[in-house]
Structures are given as structure tokens and as C-alpha cells.
């Protein structure tokens, strides 16, 4: 019932606007005043139907606004077309000015119509190619969850392509890499391609975190590996320690150049980032040294003749000083 009343009021408003337009055409008004009258009627037809009450006491929806705009465009353009024969010669120019104004309103109407369908677009997952929106909805109904899921799926693919070539993926690795949870490293070492382009041309080694296995730092013991496998991991730890220590020196040189104003590549605004890198690197060195020490102890237990600087340093620091 209320919808019928709303439609009736819209028709009445359009009819009154047409009559008002006809009266304006017979009045002796200058061009500027005539244009103001046209715009006033135009706005009247756009915003008054939008404020009409509907069921529940709420204002009209965007769809009702679009319907009102389309109705106004049809009737008002027809009115102006038939009223053109009554226009004085000095008012013809202002008629075309208003025609352009009306055309812009038509574009405005099209924008509202496109915006009305954005909710349906966002509810469709990119994976299903724009099929049934219900197929692309996430359990929570949040489109951000769909986007995050697609992003994580792409991240899992990237992890798989950059996986270390020294070992083939096992069934356990596949379960980790292709699970629906956040990607994890598991018990296998994963290499990422180094950004050797820009950084290498600037004499900077890439800051890549290459960890072995979290179990090396726990009380559960090392994974079951033979001596060859342990030495392979230890070699990687040694490379990481050298890399991180070299990067500390290079970051210090970059920070010194920024402070002295002779840094050729990085702007002053990058100083904070390099300070954060410099703060992270000692922690990375400490972690790798701890993992390397655990590896050395495990190898030493299997091969008593094994020697490594990490074992020597650890023994010297653990022994009490002689008085």
C-alpha cells in the first residue's frame, strides 16, 4: 500500500514539475534566472522522492531513487522538447545549457545503477569465473575472506615453486603446502629466489631468512638425520651466519652514507628501514649459531673426530674461567 502511495506521489511531483516548467516558459525571465528555475525543478524531482517514507519508517532505497530519476528524465525532457516552440530567441542558448545539465544527470543515474550491483559483484569469487554468487561465498559471508583465501592459495603455489631442489617433496610436505591453513615451513628447508637484481647492482646482499627447522630449537630433539644430512644443514647455517654478518657491515655503510649525505642510492627516508634491518640481523646470527651448535653436538655424538668453530666457541664460553 505504501509503495503505491509513493509511486502516486512521484507522479504528482513530476506532473507539478511539468506545469511549473510550462509557467516558467511564459514568464519574462532573463537567461540566468531561467536556468536557476530549471535546476530547482530538477533537484526537486531528484531528492523529494528519495526522502519519502516507506515501510518501517525508513527512507526510500537507492532503487526508488533511480526509478524517480528515470521518470523525471522521461517526463521533463518531453516537456522541454514540446516547450521549445514557446522559447524566445534569446532563451534558446540557455535551453541547450540546461540540456547539457540534464545529460549529466542521466550519467549520474547510470553511476547509481552500476553502484547498485556492486554487492553482487563482490560476493562472486574470482575462481568460479563469475558464476553463481552462492558458489563463491565464504562461510563467514565476508568478501575479504574470499580475497584472503585466494591470496593464500597463490602464496602456497609460490612456496611450492621456490622449494629447495636438494630434496623432493614428501606426502607430509604436500599436506603442509596445500592445506587450507596459513602456509607453514614444516620440517623442510625452503629457499626463496634472491632479489639479485636491484640489490646486487647496489652491492647489497638480499636479506633472505633461510631457517632450517623449528624443532632444532626445542627440547624435543633433532629430527632423525644421518651425519651427511646434519652436515648439509650445518653448511647452510654457516652460510647464513656469514651472510648476516656481511649484511651488518653493508647496512652500517649505508647508514653512514645517509648520515653524511653521500649515499648514492637510498634516500634519507630509508634510514628507519635500515635501522630495523640492522636490529634484526644480530638476532638472526644468534639463532643460526644456536642451531649450528645443536647440529655440531649431534654430529659430534655420531662422529667423535668432528670439529667445528661453533663447538670451540661454545666450549670456551661454557667453561668457567680459571682463577
Swiss-Prot record:
Broad class of where this protein is predominantly found: mitochondrion
Residue spans crossing the bilayer: 8-28, 32-52, 92-112
Keyword Mitochondrion: yes or no? yes
Question: Per the record, GO CC terms?
Answer: mitochondrial membrane
Q: Which UniProt keywords apply?
A: Membrane, Mitochondrion, Transmembrane, Transmembrane helix
Its membrane topology, per UniProt?
Multi-pass membrane protein
* Compartment(s): Mitochondrion membrane
Please identify the protein, giving its name as recorded. Answer: Uncharacterized mitochondrial protein urf-LM
Q: Taxonomy-wise, where does this protein's organism fall, top ranks first?
A: Eukaryota, Fungi, Dikarya, Ascomycota, Pezizomycotina
Amino acid at each position: 500500500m505504501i509503495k503505491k502511495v509513493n509511486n502516486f506521489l512521484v507522479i504528482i511531483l513530476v506532473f507539478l514539475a511539468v506545469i511549473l516548467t510550462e509557467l516558467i516558459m511564459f514568464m519574462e525571465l532573463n537567461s540566468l534566472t531561467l536556468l536557476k528555475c530549471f535546476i530547482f525543478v530538477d533537484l526537486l524531482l531528484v531528492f523529494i522522492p528519495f526522502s519519502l517514507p516507506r515501510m518501517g519508517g525508513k527512507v526510500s532505497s537507492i532503487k526508488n531513487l533511480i526509478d524517480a530519476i528515470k521518470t523525471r528524465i522521461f517526463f521533463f525532457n518531453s516537456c522541454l522538447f514540446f516547450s521549445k516552440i514557446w522559447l524566445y530567441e534569446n532563451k534558446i542558448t540557455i535551453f541547450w545549457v540546461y540540456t547539457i545539465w540534464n545529460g549529466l544527470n542521466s550519467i549520474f543515474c547510470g553511476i547509481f545503477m552500476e553502484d547498485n550491483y556492486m554487492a553482487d559483484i563482490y560476493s562472486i569469487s574470482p575462481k568460479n569465473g563469475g558464476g553463481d554468487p552462492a558458489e563463491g561465498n565464504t562461510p563467514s559471508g565476508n568478501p575479504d575472506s574470499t580475497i584472503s583465501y585466494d591470496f593464500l592459495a597463490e602464496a602456497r603455489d609460490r612456496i611450492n615453486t621456490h622449494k629447495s631442489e636438494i630434496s623432493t617433496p614428501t606426502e607430509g610436505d604436500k599436506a603442509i603446502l596445500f592445506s587450507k591453513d596459513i602456509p607453514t615451513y614444516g620440517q623442510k628447508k625452503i629457499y626463496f629466489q634472491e632479489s639479485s637484481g636491484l640489490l646486487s647492482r647496489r652491492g647489497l646482499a638480499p636479506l633472505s631468512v633461510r631457517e632450517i627447522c623449528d624443532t632444532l630449537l626445542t627440547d624435543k630433539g633433532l629430527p632423525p638425520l644421518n651425519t651427511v644430512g646434519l652436515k648439509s644443514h650445518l653448511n647452510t647455517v654457516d652460510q647464513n651466519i656469514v651472510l648476516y654478518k656481511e649484511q651488518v657491515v653493508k647496512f652500517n655503510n649505508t647508514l653512514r652514507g645517509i648520515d653524511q649525505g653521500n649515499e648514492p642510492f637510498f634516500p634519507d627516508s630509508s634510514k628507519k628501514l635500515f635501522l630495523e634491518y640492522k636490529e634484526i640481523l644480530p638476532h638472526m646470527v644468534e639463532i643460526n649459531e644456536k642451531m649450528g651448535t645443536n647440529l655440531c653436538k649431534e654430529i659430534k655424538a655420531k662422529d667423535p673426530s668432528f670439529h667445528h668453530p661453533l663447538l670451540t666457541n661454545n666450549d670456551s664460553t661454557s667453561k668457567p674461567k680459571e682463577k
